[in-house]
Amino acid sequence: MKLIEQHQIFGGSQQVWAHNAQTLQCEMKFAVYLPNNPENRPLGVIYWLSGLTCTEQNFITKSGFQRYAAEHQVIVVAPDTSPRGEQVPNDAAYDLGQGAGFYLNATEQPWATNYQMYDYILNELPDLIEANFPTNGKRSIMGHSMGGHGALVLALRNRERYQSVSAFSPILSPSLVPWGEKAFSAYLGEDREKWQQYDASSLIQQGYKVQGMRIDQGLEDEFLPTQLRTEDFIETCRVANQPVDVRFHKGYDHSYYFIASFIGEHIAYHAEFLK
């Protein structure tokens, strides 16, 4: 691991590290916020998964989460959204390739060699965090848009690994919307059965459950009618008896202005599960 950046903020330390990711076969960066913790007590960890086009930088520079992580004494980890590097396959479009890993394990070439983000987020990154920082072994996960999709899928499929899950403006039925259909076709092939393991709505229909989930969605979000399918997800959860707290917010869009407005409530929500 190599320290790339370090900034003091709200009494704690916002850091960016680089490491050679075996799962992805490339160098990866991740951000970690360490609240002021002079006694080096073990703390819970919240993983944040960002959306399309993002790196590890967007969340740490735009959301203002550090104030709340410091207050609630939680470590927050924000990885990049895909493998990176000149040797890593890419696409000219914003919604495929680098910056658009979709938090899955690709099976199709040329993507399969590097695009194993599901395994990276589930196993390699937490192992690295827990070996190098003062953690208590408890994890929660949250994300935005493509990252909200990733957070929900990881939590549903690995209930024992995450204490809680939340999302901002998540892609809830990627198998049925343009973003997901494009990415899944490329990464997983044309067999739609293979897509279902990375579709939160489908997982709930299959019987996967979590203790509860929290979702915030802006009503001025330009992607709400075509890409997110929030109302359908609420109905899927109702039929499956899966508790979900979805809050719609008048006037808010898909941007980090929306995330910054409510990130404090999400940090507080997860902190209760991480004690």
Swiss-Prot record:
Which keywords does UniProt give here? Hydrolase, Serine esterase
Which Gene Ontology CC terms are recorded? cytosol
Catalysed reaction(s) here are: S-formylglutathione + H2O = formate + glutathione + H(+)
- EC number(s) reported in the record: 3.1.2.12
Q: Name one GO biological process term.
A: formaldehyde catabolic process
> Please, which domain of life does this record's source organism belong to?
Bacteria
Which sites are catalytic? 145 (charge relay system), 221 (charge relay system), 254 (charge relay system)
Q: What does this protein do?
A: Serine hydrolase involved in the detoxification of formaldehyde. Hydrolyzes S-formylglutathione to glutathione and formate.
NCBIfam families membership: fghA_ester_D (TIGR02821)
User: Per its record, how is this protein called by name?
Assistant: S-formylglutathione hydrolase
Lineage at the top is: Bacteria, Pseudomonadati, Pseudomonadota, Gammaproteobacteria, Pasteurellales
